[in-house]
């Protein structure tokens, strides 16, 4: 009896136990679909949506002339309003461009920092934005000044720069420090090329290019919003894939190989997506410095997740650009500063802090 009972027990099917990571909730999507949702990241994203909405309302209301929130709502809903010219023609399209540019920079920075595993691996530090700028400024000096064409030229320049950095940094693998240092070297070289174009071009065109290089939303309208808007819409499935693929990038090569994950292709796909987004954003508003550096790191600290959350990073990027442009318009009124000046003033000290902290971590806490 005992032997029979033991055999029956041993042959009984064993149910698989699913372990849910701490801090996550299971959300049902249809009869069969389920996915994990990080609770803190969801709360942070909801809070950022509210903050972004408040910033957008302030952006549309505040300017040389104040517009009541009720009039802003009328314009957005398409109802007759005396503020149609100020809000609908001037402020709203400029704000939409800022939202799209900030979101693109935020996602691009998150993807590239994830692959490089280095908070300094921002598109505007490792040469991607400089490559986009060099080709764009070169095109402007030859008479191509249409903002509907420049974003696509920026993509070509950004991809070319990223390919060079990736090729020179690859030595049987992608080492984070080597990737960043080679990127900084290319950024310096490409900035010199851009300066050469400025000195050889027509004075008026060079002046226009110089303003563009500081990162500005001045004069941006619906025609500038269309290219980057369509790009984000077309790349939305790739962005959703990237949000899931981020987890595999944090694996070591042996673990990824054992699980059948082609880690090299995943990394290349994430970098390519980040390069395209950063380049299109650069072509639309110029190199708005440090947005791609700030947004992902702040998002990660707010959510406390292992990976940089793309949604929170995109929302923070949009908040930084739109709020920065609002402050740039009002702080020194009637003089209007480019938004890139304000983001650089905030981002540069943060970059210095990151470098100092990294040095202290490597030296065991000693200066």
What are these language model-derived features?
Residues 2-367:
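Alpha-helical transmembrane segments in inner-membrane proteins
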């Amino acid at each position: 009896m005992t032997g029979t009972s033991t055999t029956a027990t041993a042959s009984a099917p064993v149910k698989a136990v699913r372990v849910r990571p701490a801090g996550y909730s299971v959300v049902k999507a249809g009869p069969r679909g389920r996915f994990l949702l990080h609770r803190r990241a969801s709360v942070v994203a909801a809070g950022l949506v509210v903050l972004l909405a408040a910033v957008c309302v302030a952006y549309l209301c505040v300017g040389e002339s104040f517009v009541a929130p009720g009039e802003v709502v009328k314009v957005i809903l398409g109802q007759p309003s005396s503020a149609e010219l100020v809000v609908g023609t001037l402020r709203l399209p400029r704000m939409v461009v800022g939202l799209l540019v900030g979101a693109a920079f935020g996602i691009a920075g998150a993807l590239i920092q994830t692959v490089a595993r280095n908070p300094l691996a921002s598109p505007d530090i490792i040469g991607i934005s400089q490559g986009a700028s060099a080709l764009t400024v070169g095109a402007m000096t030859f008479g191509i000044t249409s903002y509907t064409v420049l974003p696509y030229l920026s993509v070509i320049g950004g991809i070319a720069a990223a390919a060079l950095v990736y090729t020179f940094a690859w030595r049987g693998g992608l080492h984070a420090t080597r990737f960043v240092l080679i990127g900084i070297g290319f950024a310096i070289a490409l900035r010199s090329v851009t300066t050469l174009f400025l000195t050889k071009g027509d004075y008026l065109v060079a002046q226009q290019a110089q303003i563009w290089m500081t990162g500005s939303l001045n004069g941006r309208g619906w025609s500038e919003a269309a290219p980057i808007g369509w790009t984000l819409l077309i790349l939305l499935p790739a962005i959703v894939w990237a949000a899931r693929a981020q987890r595999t990038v944090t694996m070591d090569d042996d673990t990824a190989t054992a699980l059948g994950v082609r880690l090299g292709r995943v990394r290349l796909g994430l970098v390519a997506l980040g390069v395209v987004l950063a380049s299109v954003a650069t072509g639309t508003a110029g190199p708005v410095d440090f947005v791609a550096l700030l947004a992902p790191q702040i998002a990660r600290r707010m959510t406390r997740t292992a990976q940089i959350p793309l949604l929170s990073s995109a929302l923070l990027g949009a908040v930084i650009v739109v709020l920065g442009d609002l402050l740039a318009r009002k702080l020194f009124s009637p003089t209007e500063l480019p938004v890139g000046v304000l983001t650089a003033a905030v981002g540069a000290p943060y970059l210095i802090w990151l470098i100092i902290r990294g040095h202290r971590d490597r030296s065991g806490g000693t200066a």
